[in-house]
Amino acid sequence: MHSPRKLFHARSSLATRRSTALVVLTSLAIGIAGFTFGLAVILIPGLRLTGRNCLTNTPPKTVRVVWDVAGNSNGVVSGEKKRHKVMGFVGIQTGFGSAGRRRSLRKTWMPSDPEGLRRLEESTGLAIRFMIGKTKSEEKMAQLRREIAEYDDFVLLDIEEEYSKLPYKTLAFFKAAYALYDSEFYVKADDDIYLRPDRLSLLLAKERSHSQTYLGCLKKGPVFTDPKLKWYEPLSHLLGKEYFLHAYGPIYALSADVVASLVALKNNSFRMFNNEDVTIGAWMLAMNVNHENHHILCEPECSPSSVAVWDIPKCSGLCNPEKRMLELHKQESCSKSPTLPSDDE
């Protein structure tokens, strides 16, 4: 949950006899130290506080994560080293062509300002940020910088933002999230689903006997071997005719122990399949994880218990998400229904 604000109280001196000279010298030393620290914060980039919430005990929301392209390390995070404690971290995967989706999210279930994000974190234990890579287009990067300046709700990954690199971005996301947040669960979500954070919080907070958990809306299905199809798998010869049990891509979660194991491995030690959800599912097969199947994460319409709503099976998310997100939010069953279903339902 939200970390309590730490208050430090200076102890009053018990000595009653201090010379005037000593008091003056002490005050002068404190003044010089304060001035020196302030100057250091201004001049030394490593000490600079960034983001809009530098007066609170929460970390800057927009930070940059360095990805090791050589693959020889497990990734490095630039900025604060202290991990922020939350119950769950939700990384909304987004791209440079999805500004409209982000606008719709901020108008519906995701707070649009730092104070709203802080209140949501306090009430649910969930920290929510957009996850985005980089592009060679300076125009698109400039647009992103303007959006960051306005909303400050991103984690920037130092990896090229391309559809073909989604498995790499997903691994970068989990490593970045683990470095920044001390969380019980790390949730990967797409920017085209309607989410109820309050219900997601309850799902993640359930008592579990297994510390390594992989939860989502689980599925199996045929392996696509036709290169003309969107979900074509070049490594189909390793998989057989049917995919193993794995979660749908729009939303799933890994427990802290699972993510810690991923973080410990070098980037170039992972098998990358063409599809991100299959890639994660394959890694889970190699680990001693408990698979949890929750259909409340893949409902086509809002219900008294739905956590995530998207247009399954027509689309891998909401069809026309910018419009559909706003339409769903106007429905009382989506935005105004209680967290827990009533006894009558």
Curated annotation (Swiss-Prot):
One of its GO terms (biological process) is protein glycosylation. GO terms for molecular function: hexosyltransferase activity. It comes from the Eukaryota. It is a single-pass type II membrane protein. Glycans are attached at residue 267. InterPro entries: Glyco_trans_31. Gene3D superfamilies: 3.90.550.50. Its cofactor is Mn(2+). PANTHER family: BETA-1,3-GALACTOSYLTRANSFERASE 13-RELATED, BETA-1,3-N-ACETYLGLUCOSAMINYLTRANSFERASE. This is Probable beta-1,3-galactosyltransferase 14. It comes from Arabidopsis thaliana (Mouse-ear cress). The lineage of its organism: Eukaryota, Viridiplantae, Streptophyta, Embryophyta, Tracheophyta.
